[in-house]
């Protein structure tokens, strides 16, 4: 027998034998839930892991600080490497991605007006990437969880993690109005981003953080215009970096490098388009279709890694543990490998009583994270103009680009990293 229950505005399912999830009200206006895996963070990483585990019969609760509308309103990169696309399909959430996503077989690098193609399909052994907006894939994951009555609870406040040591089961608390809700679980997944509470729950004498802050940001514009090029263009220019990207055949995304001191209000649409054209090859600039911006924002660039990615019964994933500059589109794709490792580790634990994957998670995830960090750092260093750059530095950048296109080994390395290193 089972009956529907209502938890903080999200419907779940109550099983009387308590094998999956239970909710009771305590004597002191405290609610209790029980699940196997509590996932903090309802972005694509948390939703995907929840969906994958659900399909294997492993129960989860997802806690998200913001509303669903807020999460879907975030504008993020839309280049998906092969591994992420495969995970979407395995999660039974990839149908629309496969129908509407743009398959890209390469990307262009422009060096002060000279543009050349990196044929990633050729140099990676036949792989490609999918261009599909993060907003859309998040919507698909929400829909997939809804179809299966997945428990995704929004607008949670004051999330706190407790008893993370391995000797006792952990639990998570959050505030719902005047009530405190407690979620008892076997494991906690921190997929709550850079500013979330999960990483902060690891003692400072255990956690080691590595960070590099870049002295510039990206001014991005989203517009309902035809993309200027079928494949992405990464443009190095003495005036600063530029990127021509897209979300679909009628939705374009463009970026230019700007000083950290710049504000969005400093840039009118006309000023943005004018500056973008100056950084592109003349023939590309001539065919650039301009229009009103739908969204405009400035994102600072930073590299960040936290070690370890496991502490007791807490496992970090995605931006909670690592951040990369957007150059090369590794952010969400790096999170995908975290989810892949956690998914398989949890399956082995619950279905095979094998904890090897859980024990090895941090080391395995970090090994791939640092390779993604290296590629993003290389792309950023290769294509941006740094304050204080002298003619010698500029020559080295151009020489690095020349070497890339003169060496099949270099092209193979770039292509392999762009489509995604194997999990």
Q: Where in the sequence are the language-model features?
A:
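Active-site-adjacent segment of FAD-dependent monooxygenases/related oxidoreductases
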Residues: 73-77, 81-148, 165
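Glycine-rich, N-terminal phosphate-binding loop of Rossmann-like dinucleotide-binding domains
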Residues: 70, 192-193, 324
């Amino acid at each position: 027998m089972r009956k529907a229950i209502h938890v903080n505005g999200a419907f779940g399912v109550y099983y009387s034998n308590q094998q999956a999830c239970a909710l009771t009200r305590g004597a002191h206006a405290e609610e209790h839930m029980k699940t196997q895996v509590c996932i903090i963070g309802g972005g694509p990483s948390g939703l995907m892991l929840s969906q994958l585990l659900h399909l294997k019969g492993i129960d989860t609760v997802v806690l998200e600080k913001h509303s669903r509308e807020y999460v879907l309103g975030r504008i993020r990169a839309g280049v998906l490497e092969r591994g992420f696309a495969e995970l979407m399909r395995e999660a039974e959430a990839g149908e629309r991605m496969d129908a509407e996503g743009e398959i890209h077989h390469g990307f262009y690098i422009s060096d002060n007006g000279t543009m050349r193609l990196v044929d990633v399909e050729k140099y990676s052994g036949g792989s490609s990437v999918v261009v599909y907006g993060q907003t859309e894939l998040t919507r698909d994951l929400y829909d997939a969880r809804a179809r299966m009555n997945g428990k995704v609870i929004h607008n949670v406040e004051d999330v706190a993690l407790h008893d993370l040591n391995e000797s006792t089961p952990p639990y998570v608390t959050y505030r719902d109005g005047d009530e405190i809700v407690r979620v008892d679980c076997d494991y906690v997944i921190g997929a709550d981003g850079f500013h979330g509470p999960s990483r902060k729950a690891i003692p400072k004498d255990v956690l080691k953080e590595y960070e590099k802050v870049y002295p510039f940001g990206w001014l991005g514009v989203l517009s309902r215009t035809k993309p200027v090029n079928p494949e992405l263009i990464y443009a190095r220019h003495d005036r600063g970096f530029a990127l021509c990207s897209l979300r679909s055949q009628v939705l374009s995304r463009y970026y230019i490098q700007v000083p950290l001191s710049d504000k969005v209000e400093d840039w009118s649409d006309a000023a943005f388009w004018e500056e973008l054209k100056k950084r592109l090859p003349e023939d590309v600039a001539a065919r650039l279709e301009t229009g009103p911006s739908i969204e405009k924002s400035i994102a600072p660039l930073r590299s960040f890694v936290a070690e370890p990615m496991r502490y007791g019964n807490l496992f970090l994933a995605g931006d909670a543990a690592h951040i990369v500059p957007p150059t090369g589109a590794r952010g969400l794709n790096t999170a995908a490998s975290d989810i892949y490792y956690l998914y398989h580790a949890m399956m082995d634990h619950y279905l095979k009583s094998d904890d090897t994957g859980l024990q090895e998670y941090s080391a395995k995830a970090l090994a791939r994270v640092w390779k993604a960090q290296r590629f993003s750092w290389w792309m950023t260093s290769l294509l941006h103009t740094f304050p204080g750059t002298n003619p010698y530095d500029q020559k080295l950048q151009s020489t690095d680009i020349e070497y890339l296109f003169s060496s099949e080994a270099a092209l193979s390395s770039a292509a392999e990293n762009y489509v995604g290193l194997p999990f």
